[in-house]
Amino acid sequence: MLNLTEAGQSRYRIVMPREADGKNRFAAQELASYILKITGAALPVVTDELPASEQEICVGPVSRDGLPDTSQLKNDGFIMASREDRIFLVGHNSRSNLYAAYSFLEDVLGCRFFTQSVEHIPQRETLRVEPFNLVKQSPFEYRETSWHGMTLPGFDPKRGFNGAHPHAPDQGEGLEDVFRYLGFGHTMFDYVNPDEYFDEHPEYFSMVEGRRIKDHTQLCLTNPEVLEITKKKLRQNIIDHPECKVFSLSQMDWYNYCECPECARVDAEEGAHSGTLIRFVNACAESIAGEFPDVLIDTFAYQYTRQAPKKTRPAPNVSVRICSIECCFTHPLAECHRAMFPFIFATTPGVTFQQDLADWSRIASHLVVWDYTTNFRFYLAPMVNLHVLQDNIRFFRDNNVTGLFEQGNGQSVSGEFGELRGYLLSKLMWEPDGDVEKWTQEFLAGYYGNAAGPIHAYIKLLAGHVTRYDLHAGIYESPKAFLHNALIPKMDALWDEAEALADNEEILERVQRSRLQVRFIKFHRKGPGDDDYDAVCEQLISDIRRHGVTYIQEGKDIEKSFDEMRHGTLPGTSRSDYRW
């Protein structure tokens, strides 16, 4: 047994390397800060220049006997181990030392970091722990989400993400061990823009139905001048942005791929429209590989390029991001082959995401999934996917996916379960086989207090509903078409109970904000002809404002959304707009 503190006093000190960088120093300071909060004991933070003592918590690669070997770790892996009375928290890179400190606080000392403002810090003046030897390593080298609150400065490392979000200054300025992109997607026009080139060089852009088009075009990827312009600008971008690890060369966010004879020939030879794309991106990537060996060139397997080419493999320094945008998200991705509205009209019959992922897995050295975890047309509508998150992340791992971007509502605080979903995603990116039910219960208890029980029952009610009726939903689903009217009284009863059980005003605010999802469903079933429509609408708008929700539809100014609510013109008001 290790006696870390006794009655608020401790013989331990925290040791870091003499030449520790900002993140390593910050890890040691955070550890001291939280141990003080837990026990009241102030542990000194020193460097390994001092002679060793028996009772030390060593953070980072300190010069001490017993230091674990991390040379075989990858993907920000780290080791937490006790050696007699000494504790080691050490990762295979600088950032993973910080992960080790936070994991020790969570897994050994019992802290929980639910959101940036909601934590559980146990109170123990006397703190004893059993000997331990733990190794943690994510199966994914890149882990990122856009859920609001998960990426706030200083919080994302507590959740183990490593996308290049804003970082608190005291975590260190170096971003060499995070995935920082230059251009995150739809970037081809950053290199060859039709506004600059089309008038003099229409041949640089897509031929569609026999003519070159400027509006909503793509690049002609077999044009040698387009390739040379792109290679030159790519090299300059890498020189100008040494802080970036990944440089995007990805199609624009629409169709209209080039049908010129040469592009058509290559795509036919490759059996997929990704043929021209991968050959083009490979040529760009190979042009910079010798000079910039640590740089990755990112591209998409998205919509018309989602199918893998039959002949050409992505170069070793090319990262392919396959996007699941067409899929159903109420069933495990491994099991459901249905394409959802509106993509059902543009999806090739017989072509499935599952097969495309497997095909890319066989040929790509770096395979990232861009996955979708919210309803982008209705941020306030329930996204009934909590029960499939683990299945999906296991599916990605089992298909040799090397990175995950789990896109959510990144524009506003959630009126649904954004905080819970972001928390679960962060845990699953490190432990796909972990205990999701335990994590869910811990989060609900920490975030909603005594109201956790009925809220948990509500989550299970929705999951059971979609399973019982085999309901499918994509990322633009209408809540009117998706959830049955008979469910609403049961929903309301559970949220009434949750509000009645709320511990205090702060908890009540969280409960009422999360209840907006049910109120939105009920409102969406009304029409301007209903007697109480105006009153219900204005009260809902007032409460949306009061709870700090600033977007309820992706990319649309909330005042425009409110006007649509008032006039009964929200998208999906007519069930004919949706297929399910």
PLM-predicted stretches and their roles:
Residues D267-S287, P314-A334, F396, L424-G434:
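Acidic, His- and aromatic-enriched active-site or binding-groove loops in soluble protein domains
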